[in-house]
Structure formats: structure tokens, C-alpha cells
Curated annotation (Swiss-Prot):
Region described as Disordered: 1-219, 245-293, 803-839
Organism lineage string: Eukaryota, Fungi, Dikarya, Basidiomycota, Agaricomycotina
Domain of life: Eukaryota
Source species of the chain: Cryptococcus neoformans var. neoformans serotype D (strain B-3501A) (Filobasidiella neoformans)
Family: Belongs to the DEAD box helicase family. DDX46/PRP5 subfamily.
Compartments where located: Nucleus
Biased composition (Low complexity): 1-19, 193-204
Sequence motif: DEAD box, positions: 560-563
Role, per record: ATP-dependent RNA helicase involved spliceosome assembly and in nuclear splicing. Catalyzes an ATP-dependent conformational change of U2 snRNP. Bridges U1 and U2 snRNPs and enables stable U2 snRNP association with intron RNA.
Gene (UniProt): PRP5
GO biological process terms held by the UniProt record: mRNA processing; RNA splicing
Domain notes: The Q motif is unique to and characteristic of the DEAD box family of RNA helicases and controls ATP binding and hydrolysis.
GO CC terms, sorted: nucleus
Protein name, as recorded: Pre-mRNA-processing ATP-dependent RNA helicase PRP5
InterPro entries named in the record: DEAD/DEAH_box_helicase_dom, Helicase_ATP-bd, Helicase_C-like, P-loop_NTPase, PRP5/DDX46/KHDC4_KH, RNA-helicase_DEAD-box_CS, RNA_helicase_DEAD_Q_motif
Keyword list, A-Z: ATP-binding, Helicase, Hydrolase, mRNA processing, mRNA splicing, Nucleotide-binding, Nucleus
Length: 1072
């Protein structure tokens, strides 16, 4: 709103005019009378009206937004003050006070005119302080009044006929008690209220001036009245006065007691009200927490009674409460172990009873041989296989190879895609594997890298899926393709995309490293084909207690790069998946290398498989130019830069020229990547330690040509298909022949030319044997220095100076998994108190795991599992001994009758057996005595030989001669920890934990002995097994320390078991 031009300069903008509403102000009338100022008045009026509206609006908002409680109290005080001020300013109150004063004056005048005024008590006497009367004086006065009343009554009866009654006094009788008199007509105003007293005391005047209520505290007291002669009064006046006085006295006595009782009741009510107010003012949060504490106490008592613990009563000592707390801690530890055991079994897929499941029937034989194939005899078929890179088949009733795509019986959509891709004829592995798979046979396909193995199992899979009804909801996939690496799974998924579109088949790629929620969503929508890694497939099958997906409809399983998959430790996951699939499902295994040791595992999974081998088991393609250079490690990087420069000059006309550099470690890949970046080369690194997103982005950029160089570990040696890849450099030599074949196979794919250069140092001579073998198999040139290195190492092996390198992908992951299983079982048995079947790791080194041959007989699996209640630690018992701890813990078992006979020498045992055969009896007691003496003498002889005869014989000769150590404690316990897992031992014996244990328990804890591996026992006279010695003069402290150590070992054992479960799927230096 614009400002008025007539605003006064001495006022603020929002303040009203001081004389705006003051009608008595002279300027007001003059302003109205002055016509020249009329417009200004109107402007000021409108301005002030708008200003008042704004002020009222602000006042309303403040009232609405005010603090309720505070403002109410403030307004209450304000209203009371305003009411008091208003009563003081009101003229009506003054008139009422004047009327009361006039009524009091009339009352005094009437009292003066009354005849009773002659016996009025002097006000000075009435105002005197009362003198307390004794009981005798009260009785005497009452008796005198009674006699006076009798005389007056007798006089009245004698003169009742003749005497005329005197007029009664209209004045009220004199008040003889401390209570105020009852109101009469003289003491009432015109409206029936008592008049104001004429002579109020100064105290009453001051209280009336300060307070708005005329309330005063009244004291009940009796006045000491003077005696009077009843003869002075005539007529009934004396009677009335005396009787009224007597009644007043009686009423006063009664009122004193009544008032005291009422005051006591009032105080009790006030106390009750205060308590009620205190209860009402209690904080709701405090009340809620108090109720929770009571409920917790009740629940703890109920749990303690249910568990058989003694519940401590109120006022019990802290010792009983400490025992209950220790029991609770132990229960929590056992619950923690049960939870860990449940988690370890969470991803377990128990095999179902296939005989009780009604599976849908399916068809897996689709191949119908064409006429030209039917007319071909076996000799012609062998010639065709020989022309196609020497195809070798093992198995019965193998189909004949096919040379054109139309003879496979594929859908028309697949043929259109094949024509669009420009594939003229099938490759060797495709010509033989596709007819075999489409005939419904289990197949093992072994072919060189880049030979089209992926299409060899994809086309039969699509025909197989197309024959069945679509998947609806969460029925599960029809076909499952498993690969060892995420990159290979993604590549298979991309390669089958063109076929999926034309056939209207849904597929999902489920690999680790990404969120599982997307995979779960895809499974719920339904997918006929799932391309996955084994670990992620297990996660999907166990997600939400198996309600996400299942493999009941799965009838086609592919394991690509099967040997690498088992070598990386995927055997448990793969076997779980296969055991859950129906036994009649079709299974296919493909790989470029398939060692003979893997055949037993393959035949365990497959049923009468056909083994198809193209070009040898581990052979580099002839299109690849292989070069091997022997040089020192310091010169490798310089030579690498020279090769990159030379190749760049040779292929400068080619825009798409890619290079793949292999190293053996993730750190080496990152270091070499940084070195190449500093030299100006655009490159990327690829290894298992990188996130999945980074790995996918690196492969995508490499295939697109944005990054021409990639430094990778062997994680990229499988399935990476880049047609423009012309150069592969093995910066670090591969450690076995199969790895060399797969690394070199990344180039020269689909008939293209490629180059593979390998660096090997003199320190890596053990790898030279496999490289020479691979070069010989592929008929490549072998350098002289490499041949000399290989022959030298073979000579060392023959002489026993060196050990041969590993044979590559031979299933070493299976042995590693088996060892881990033994470690886990041993840890569980040790933790649960059973060490009878503990085995030494050294006894399992180099052991060959036997595989049972696959049979057609199906046996329902055992589904009985131990419950979680078995995971308890009740077997952990430690004896608390009353006495000082021994100086040395014996490493040999204590002699007892159970092991008495077993501990005898071989000659003694032979003599006993001979005596039994001859029928001679042997007394058990005599035998025990003899055995004890023999054992003692044998030990003494051994000790003398070791030079310990004096130390061992002295205690035996004089057992009581040993003096007690003044620092020895009264109680001790020995807690053995040698057989617990390493994580549990470390957790119980680290410095911080030992300090904490001593502070909590108050006992002394020291570590004795040394660690012995499982299966190894201490030698005679050697240090005992690792244990903890607990000492204290208080038994409760020793017991508390034992319980605390027990809890720590339980938690450490749980963590060790979980670590073994997590590490089961990953092993070796190859990470997924």
C-alpha cells in the first residue's frame, strides 16, 4: 500500500495519530469544521483503517500460532489482574460498600436503643486475650448456670398467672463463644447479605486493600466473660440470655471438635490431591520405560525357569546374578553358532527324490538324416571326418557328419540368421556335434579355439526349447548354459540374441558382480534359456527358500569350458545343479582342452556320451604364428615396446588392429597398464579383481576399437572372441600347456591369421617343457635356446633335482575342494569335541580322488539332515582343580586300565596272545600292576638315555619332598586350544583379548606349550600341545575365565566355519 503524503514526521509509519479517536481534543472539532482539511481527514481515516486491519490480522495470527500452555497461564493471570482492576474502577462496588457502611451504622444505633445494652460487655474486655480455664472452673460455672436456671424456672411457674411479660429485646444476645453469631434482621442488608462490620481491624483493612476477596482466617477461641447476677434481669430476658449463652457455649464446644475434624479431612484431601497431581504430571516416557523394565524382568524369570536355572530372589547377592548372566552369555554363543550353521546350510540344495516328482514328458531326438547321409557308408564317413581336421569319435552309434546347414532340420528362422551372418558351411565341430546333440545323445565336444563350439550347442538348444511349451511364471528355465567366467557368459548371451528374436524365445544372462534383484525379476517373468555362472545360479535357486525359480522343467544343460569350470572350484555348485535336474535331461560338455583325468568326472555326469575331438585335445590352430623368446625379466618391457612399434608399422594401413597382453598376476596387470599409459599407449586392464561393470566396459571398448590394447590375466583367455585381434603377447609365460593353448587361441579365429609371442625367462625353465610340447603338437618352429632349456629341465627331473610342473587343467580344483572339506569336517569335529577321525593334511597330498562309474540305477538320496540343535558346545569340559598348577604339563597320556594293554611292547603283547591260545588265564589286577611297573621302567630308561634321569626320578623317589611355591595359587584350570581352528586360537590368544580376559575374570591367564598340526602328537619329553593355564585363589574367578574363553572359542570357530564355506567356490590364483 503506498504511503500517504500527509504522514506526520514525528510518528512512525505504522503508529496511529495520538488524537485520532480523542473527541475531546480541540483539533478534532477544528478538523471537521475546516472544509479545506476534509480530504486530508478522509485520507488519514482510510489509512488508519487499513492499518487497524493489518494490526488485527497480525494479532489474530499471533493468537493462532501462540504457545498454548504458556499463553494460557499468561492469559489467566492477565484476566485476573484485569478483573481486579475493573472492580476497583467500577462505581457499583463503591456504592455497595457505602450501603454496607450505612447498614452497620443503623445496627449500632439499634443496639444503643436496645435494653440489652445495659449488660453489654466492655469491648476492652472482649478484645482482651482469653485466659485458659481449668476443668474445675468450667464445671463450677456450668453448675451455677444450672442452679440459676432452676430458680428462674420455679419463679416463673409461681408468677405465671399474675405477672405481665416484659417486652423482649430485639437486639441479639451477647456472643459468649468464639464463633460469630447467627445473622439476624439487624445484621442483614436489603438484599439479604451480611453488612460490612463498622469497625474492621487494621489488618482486615490492609488485606481488603491488597486482595480482591474479603476472606480472612478465623480462629476458634473462647472468651473469658465476667460473672453476672441473674437477679438483675427481670422477666424472661435473663432466661433467654442465660439459656442462649449456655446453648452458645455448647455449640461452641461442639463446633471446635467439628472444625478440627473438618480441617484434618481437608488436609488429607489436599495430600491426596497432591499425590494425584504428581501422578498426573509423570512423564509418559518414564512410565513406558518402567513398564518395559518390569516386562523384561518377568520374561527373564520365565526363561530362566524354563531353562532350569535358579531365579535369584529380590535382595540376593550379586554372585547368583553373575551366574545367570554367564548362562545367558553361553546361550547367546550357542544361538550364534546355530545361526551360523543355518547360514552355512542356507545355500544347500538337497537333491530331491526324482521318483516322487511327476515330470512333463519331452522329446530330445529331432535329427532325421538326409538321403545323402543315409547313402554314405562308414568308410566314406571316415574319409569325410579325416578331411574335416581329423574328427575323432569315441562312442557307439555316432551319426555321420553333415556338410550343409539345411540338413540339420533347423527352423527356418535359424537358417535366415545363419545366411545373414554369412556362414556358408558348418565347421568341423559343428558338422559332427550338431547331429549328435539333435539325436538326443550326451556329448563331450573338444575342439580348437575359434572353431565355432558356441554355435554347435546353441542351435540344438534352440530346437530343443522350441519343441516345448513356453515357460509361464516361475516354472524355471528349459535350458541352462553354465560358463566359468562372466565374460564368457555375456559373450554367449550376445551370440544367441539374433536367434532368440526370430524364434520368440526369452533368455536371461545371470552372472555375479551385479545386483541379483534384476535376475530375480527376469526369473519371475519367465525365461526359457538361462546363461549363467554356477554361483549365481545357486543363489537364484536358493533365493526366498527356493520360491524364485527351480530346475524341474530343465531338460538341456550345457557346460562350456567344463575343465576350467571344475578347475576353478565350481564342482560343488555344478553337482548341486545337476543333481536337482531330472536324470533324463540331456547334458553337453564343450571345451578346447579336456585332460584325461577329467574323463572320469564327465562320465560320472553323462550317460553313454559321445566324445568328439577335432584337431587334438590341446593343439594351437595352424593359422596362428607362434614365436617364443628366451630373455631376462629386465628386458621384457623394452622388447614389448619394440614389438608394439613394429606391429604398428606393419599394420599401419589397418584401422582395426588389436593387441592382447597376458600376465600372471593382477598386480602385474595394473603395473604394466600404468607403464604403457605413461608411454602414450591407449590401453585398459582386465582381471578378476576389477568390478564387473569395469570388466564389461573394458571388453566393450576393446571390441569397438576404442581401446586397441588390453592387459589381462588368464581370465580373458577363455571365450574372448574379437575378430580384429591380431597379436597376443604372453608377457609372463603360461604355467601349463592348456593355458598356453587358450591364450594363443584368442587370435587367428574363424580362419583369420594371427600372431602369438611368448616371453620366457631362464628362471621359468619348468614351464618350457609344456611350451615345447604345444609347439610340437602344432608343428611350429621351436627355438634352440628353448629346446636346450627344456632338455636341461627334463634332465633335472630324471636326476631328482627338480619336480615337474603341473599338468594344467587336470581337475586340481577337485582335490583342493576335497582338502577344504576335510579341513571343515575336522574343524567341526574338533569344535564339537570329536577328534578321533582327524586326519593330517600331509597324508592327503597328491592323493587321487576316485570316481564311481555312472550307473543307470537310481537310488533315492538320503534326506535326513541333522538339526540345528546338534550345534552345541556341551562337550567342551574343563576341569577346575583345587591346588597349585603343575610346573610342566605332561605330553603323554595318563596311564589307565583302558590303554594299559595297548601300551605294552610288542613282545609282551605276543606273550599274552600265546598265553590266551594255550588256555592260561591272566588276572586283570595282576596284569595292571605288571603293566604299570613295565611302563614305569621303560619311561625311566628312556629318560636316562635322554639325560633326564635325575629330573624324572627325584619326584618319584620323594613325592612329598617337594616344597610348595609361596606364589602358587589355590585353584587352576588347563584349557586345551591346540585342536581349535586357527581363527579361534588367534582370537583367544591375541594380546588385547588376553588383557581383556584378565580384566573381566580377575584370574591370571598364560599360554603353555606349542601348536601341533592335526594328527601329530608331541614327542616324549617334548613340549605339550597348546593350552591356556588359568590360575587364581578364587574358584569363581577361574570359572569365569573358563566360561569367557569358551565363549571366545565358540565365536572364533563359527567364523572359521563360515570362512571355509565362503572360500569353497574360489581357489587358486584364478578369480571369477
Amino acid at each position: 500500500m503506498p504511503r500517504s503524503p500527509y504522514r506526520s514526521s514525528n510518528r512512525s509509519y505504522r503508529s496511529p495519530s495520538p488524537s485520532r479517536y480523542d473527541r475531546s481534543h480541540p483539533s478534532s472539532s477544528s478538523r471537521r469544521q475546516d472544509d479545506r482539511k476534509a480530504s486530508r481527514y478522509d485520507d488519514d481515516y482510510s489509512r488508519d483503517r487499513e492499518r487497524d486491519r493489518e494490526r488485527e490480522r497480525d494479532r489474530t495470527r499471533d493468537y493462532r500460532d501462540r504457545d498454548r500452555d504458556y499463553d494460557r497461564r499468561r492469559d489467566k493471570d492477565r484476566y485476573r489482574d484485569d478483573d481486579r482492576d475493573r472492580r476497583r474502577r467500577d462505581d457499583k462496588d463503591d456504592r455497595r460498600r457505602e450501603e454496607r457502611d450505612r447498614g452497620s451504622d443503623r445496627k449500632r444505633d439499634s443496639e444503643r436503643r436496645s435494653p440489652m445494652s445495659t449488660i453489654r460487655v466492655d469491648p476492652i474486655v472482649s478484645l482482651a486475650s482469653p485466659v485458659p480455664e481449668t476443668e474445675e472452673e468450667k464445671k463450677r460455672k456450668a453448675k451455677e448456670r444450672l442452679e440459676t436456671w432452676k430458680r428462674q424456672r420455679a419463679l416463673k411457674e409461681g408468677k405465671s398467672a399474675a405477672a405481665t411479660p416484659e417486652p423482649k429485646s430485639t437486639a441479639p444476645p451477647p456472643v459468649t463463644s468464639g464463633l460469630p453469631p447467627k445473622p439476624t434482621a439487624f445484621s442483614l442488608s436489603r438484599i439479604g447479605l451480611p453488612l460490612k462490620p463498622t469497625n474492621p481491624t487494621p489488618l482486615k483493612r490492609s488485606m481488603a486493600a491488597l486482595d480482591d476477596e474479603d476472606t480472612s482466617d478465623r480462629k476458634l477461641q473462647k472468651l473469658d466473660l465476667p460473672d453476672f447476677d441473674p437477679e438483675v434481669q427481670s422477666g424472661d430476658a435473663a432466661q433467654v440470655g442465660s439459656i442462649g449463652a449456655d446453648l452458645a457455649v455448647a455449640d461452641g464446644d461442639e463446633d471446635d471438635d467439628t472444625v478440627v475434624k473438618k480441617e484434618e479431612e481437608k488436609e488429607e484431601k489436599m495430600d491426596i490431591d497432591k499425590k494425584a497431581e504428581e501422578d498426573e504430571e509423570e512423564d509418559p516416557l518414564d512410565a513406558f520405560m518402567r513398564d518395559n523394565v518390569q516386562q523384561v524382568v518377568e520374561v527373564n524369570k520365565a526363561d530362566a525357569k524354563r531353562m532350569g536355572l535358579r531365579v535369584a530372589e529380590d535382595g540376593s547377592d550379586d554372585e547368583n546374578q553373575g551366574q545367570v548372566v554367564e548362562k545367558d552369555k553361553l546361550a547367546e554363543a550357542e544361538a550364534l553358532l546355530q545361526q551360523a550353521a543355518a547360514k552355512s546350510r542356507k545355500k544347500d540344495l538337497p537333491p530331491p527324490d526324482h521318483s516322487k516328482i511327476d515330470y512333463e514328458p519331452f522329446r530330445k531326438a529331432f535329427y532325421v538324416p538326409p538321403v545323402e547321409v543315409l547313402e554314405m557308408d562308414e568308410e566314406e564317413a571316415e574319409l569325410v571326418r579325416l578331411e574335416m581336421d581329423g574328427i575323432k569319435i569315441r562312442g557307439q552309434d555316432a551319426p555321420k557328419p553333415v556338410r550343409n546347414w539345411g540338413a540339420f532340420g533347423l527352423p527356418q528362422g535359424c537358417l535366415d540368421v545363419i545366411k545373414h551372418q554369412g556362414w556358408e558351411t558348418p565347421t568341423s565341430i559343428q558338422a559332427q556335434a550338431i547331429p549328435a546333440i539333435m539325436s538326443g545323445r550326451d556329448v563331450i565336444g573338444i575342439a580348437k579355439t575359434g572353431s565355432g563350439k558356441t554355435v554347435a550347442f546353441l542351435l540344438p538348444m534352440l530346437r530343443h526349447v522350441r519343441d516345448q511349451r513356453p515357460v509361464s511364471g516361475s516354472e524355471g528355465p528349459i535350458a541352462v548354459v553354465m560358463s566359468p567366467t562372466r565374460e564368457l557368459a555375456s559373450q554367449i548371451y550376445k551370440e544367441c540374441q539374433p536367434f532368440l528374436k526370430v524364434l520368440n524365445i526369452r533368455a536371461s544372462c545371470c552372472v555375479g558382480g551385479s545386483s541379483i534383484s534384476e535376475d530375480i525379476a527376469a526369473m519371475k517373468k519367465g525365461a526359457e534359456v538361462v546363461i549363467c555362472t554356477p554361483g549365481r545360479m545357486i543363489d537364484l535357486l536358493t533365493a526366498n527358500n527356493g520360491r524364485v525359480t527351480n530346475v524341474r522343467r530343465t531338460t538341456y544343460i550345457v557346460m562350456d569350458e567344463a575343465d576350467r569350470m571344475f578347475d576353478m572350484g565350481f564342482e560343488p555348485q555344478v553337482m548341486k545343479i545337476i543333481n536337482n535336474v531330472r536324470p533324463s535331461a540331456q547334458k553337453v560338455l564343450f571345451s578346447a582342452t579336456f585332460p584325461k583325468t577329467m574323463e572320469s568326472l564327465a562320465r560320472r555326469i553323462l550317460v553313454k556320451p559321445l566324445e568328439i575331438t577335432v584337431g587334438g585335445r590341446s593343439v594351437v590352430a595352424p593359422e596362428i604364428d607362434q614365436r617364443v623368446e628366451v630373455r631376462d625379466g629386465d628386458t621384457k618391457f623394452t622388447r614389448l615396446l619394440e614389438i608394439l612399434g613394429e606391429m604398428g608399422e606393419e599394420h599401419k594401413d589397418e584401422d582395426d588392429f588389436r593387441t592382447l597382453i597376458f600376465v600372471d598376476r593382477q598386480e602385474s596387470a595394473d603395473d604394466l597398464f600404468r607403464e604403457l599409459l605413461q608411454r602414450g599407449y591407449v590401453c585398459a586392464s582386465l582381471h578378476g579383481g576389477k568390478e564387473q561393470v569395469d570388466r564389461d566396459e573394458a571388453i566393450k571398448n576393446f571390441k569397438n576399437g576404442d581401446v586397441p590394447i588390453i592387459v589381462a590375466t588368464s581370465v580373458a583367455a577363455r571365450g574372448l572372441d574379437v575378430k580384429e585381434l591380431k597379436l597376443v603377447i604372453n608377457y609372463d609365460a603360461p604355467n601349463h600347456m592348456e593355458d598356453y593353448v587358450h591364450r594363443a587361441g584368442r587370435t587367428g579365429r574363424a580362419g583369420n591369421k594371427g600372431t602369438c609371442i611368448t616371453f620366457i625367462t631362464p628362471e621359468q625353465e619348468r614351464f618350457s617343457v609344456d611350451i615345447v610340447r604345444a609347439l610340437e603338437a602344432s608343428k611350429a618352429f621351436i627355438p634352440d635356446d628353448l629346446k636346450k632349456m627344456s632338455d636341461s629341465f627334463l634332465g633335472k627331473i630324471k636326476s631328482g633335482k627338480a619336480r615337474a610342473a603341473g599338468s594344467g587343467y587336470s581337475g586340481k580344483g577337485l582335490e583342493r575342494i576335497e582338502r577344504r572339506r576335510e579341513e571343515k569336517d575336522r574343524a567341526e569335529k574338533t569344535t564339537y569335541g570329536d577328534t578321533s577321525e582327524a586326519l593330517s593334511l600331509s597324508s592327503r597330498e597328491g592323493a587321487v580322488i576316485p570316481y564311481k562309474a555312472k550307473t543307470n540305477e537310481f537310488k533315492p538320496p538320503e534326506t535326513s539332515h541333522k538339526g540345528e540343535a546338534d550345534y552345541t558346545f556341551t562337550e567342551i569340559k574343563v576341569d577346575i582343580v583345587n591346588g597349585p598348577a603343575p610346573d610342566r604339563v605332561s605330553s603323554q597320556p595318563v596311564f589307565n586300565p583302558k590303554n594299559a594293554v595297548a601300551s605294552l611292547p610288542a613282545q609282551t603283547l605276543a606273550a599274552l596272545e600265546k598265553a590266551k591260545k594255550e588256555g592260561r588265564g591272566v588276572d586283570a589286577a595282576n596284569l595292571a600292576n605288571v603293566v604299570a611297573k613295565l611302563t614305569q621302567s621303560i619311561e625311566l630308561t628312556k629318560a636316562e638315555k635322554l639325560g633326564l634321569a635325575a629330573a624324572t626320578s627325584a619326584p618319584r623317589l620323594a613325592p612329598g619332598a617337594r616344597t610348595k611355591d609361596p606364589d602358587a595359587t589355590d585353584w587352576h584350570a588347563i584349557f586345551p586350544i591346540n585342536d581349535y581352528p586357527q581363527k579361534a586360537r588367534w582370537k583367544a590368544t591375541n594380546k588385547e583379548q588376553m588383557t581383556l580376559l584378565q580384566e573381566v575374570s580377575g584370574a591370571s591367564i598364560t599360554m603353555r606349550g606349542r601348536f601341533y598340526p592335526p594328527g601329530e602328537e608331541p614327542a616324549l619329553g617334548g613340549e605339550p600341545k597348546l593350552s591356556l593355564l588359568i590360575e587364581s585363589n578364587d574358584e569363581m574367578r577361574v570359572r569365569a575365565a573358563v566360561e569367557e574363553i569358551r565363549r571366545v572359542l565358540v565365536e572364533g570357530s563359527v567364523q572359521a566355519l563360515n570362512a571355509v564355506d565362503r572360500a569353497g567356490a574360489s581357489g587358486g590364483r584364478y578369480a571369477v
